[in-house]
Design a protein with these regions (language model features):
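Positively charged, low-complexity/disordered segments
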Residues: 1-3, 203-206, 210-216
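Amphipathic alpha-helical "coupling" segments that flank catalytic cores
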Residues: 4-201, 205
Length: 216
C-alpha cells in the first residue's frame, strides 16, 4: 500500500465476522506475506534479464490472431512512434528503443504472476538496467490512461509511446472488424479511443499535444 507516494506496511481486510481471536487477521497476513515473497523472488530473478536481448523472444508470444506476435506489434510501434516523434520534435532513436522493449516485461514471471503490473514492471526493469528516466517513464505509462479519472501521461516520450500503442490496437482490431457494439466492447476500444482524444484535443491543462501523423 502507498500513502502519498510512500510505502507502508499497513493493509486493510474486510471481514463479515468479528475477529476476537485475531485469526482472520493472522490468516490474511500470511497470504499477503506469501504473495510479497513471491514478488520479491520473481523481482530478484527477472530484473537482470536483458531487455534488449529479450526483444527477439517476443516472436514466440502471439498478440492476436491476424495481428501477429508481440514482436510484430513492437515493430509497428517503432514506425508509429517515429512518425509521432517528428511532430513532437523528440529523439526518434529513443522512441524506437522504448517501443522495441516496452513489451518485454510480458515475458517475465513477475508479470505472469501479477499481470496487472505489465508496463509498470517494464519501467522498473528498465530503471534497474540503467535506461534513462524518459524511457523508463514511457514504458511505465504506456497503458495510461486506464479509465475515467486515470492519470494521463504528460511527458513527450510517454505520450508518444502511449499514443502509438493505442493507435496500433485500434487500427488492428477495426481492420479485423472486431468493433465494439452498443452492448459489448471486450477489447476496451472505446477507452483507447478516448485516450487518444485526450492527447490530441485542446485542453486547458499544461499538456504536450500530439498531432496525429497523416500516415497514421
Amino acid at each position: 500500500m502507498c500513502i502519498r507516494d510512500s510505502l507502508t506496511n499497513v493493509f486493510f481486510v474486510v471481514a463479515d465476522n468479528i475477529d476476537t481471536k485475531g485469526l482472520i487477521r493472522l490468516g490474511n497476513e500470511r497470504v499477503v506475506e506469501a504473495r510479497l515473497n513471491d514478488a520479491q523472488f520473481f523481482w530478484d530473478k527477472n530484473k537482470t534479464k536483458n531487455l534488449v536481448k529479450g526483444i527477439s523472444d517476443l516472436k514466440n508470444v502471439n498478440y492476436f490472431e491476424g495481428l501477429g506476435t508481440y514482436f510484430d506489434k513492437t515493430q509497428r510501434l517503432r514506425k508509429l512512434g517515429s512518425l509521432i516523434s517528428d511532430e513532437l520534435l523528440i529523439s526518434k532513436e529513443k522512441v524506437e528503443l522504448s517501443a522495441s522493449i516496452c513489451k518485454v516485461d510480458l515475458l517475465s514471471e513477475l508479470v505472469g504472476e501479477f499481470p496487472e503490473l505489465q508496463g509498470v514492471m517494464g519501467g522498473y526493469f528498465a530503471s534497474a538496467q540503467g535506461f534513462d528516466k524518459d524511457l523508463v517513464m514511457a514504458i511505465s505509462e504506456q497503458y495510461l490512461p486506464t479509465g475515467s479519472g486515470s492519470r494521463v501521461p504528460k511527458k513527450p516520450f510517454s505520450i508518444t509511446l502511449s499514443l502509438a500503442d493505442k493507435i496500433d490496437t485500434l487500427v488492428g482490431f477495426f481492420g479485423l472488424n472486431q468493433k465494439p457494439t452498443s452492448s459489448k466492447d471486450p477489447y476496451a476500444l472505446r477507452r483507447l479511443a478516448l485516450g487518444c482524444l485526450l492527447y490530441t484535443s485542446p485542453s486547458p491543462r499544461d499538456r504536450t499535444r500530439a498531432r496525429m501523423p497523416s500516415s497514421a
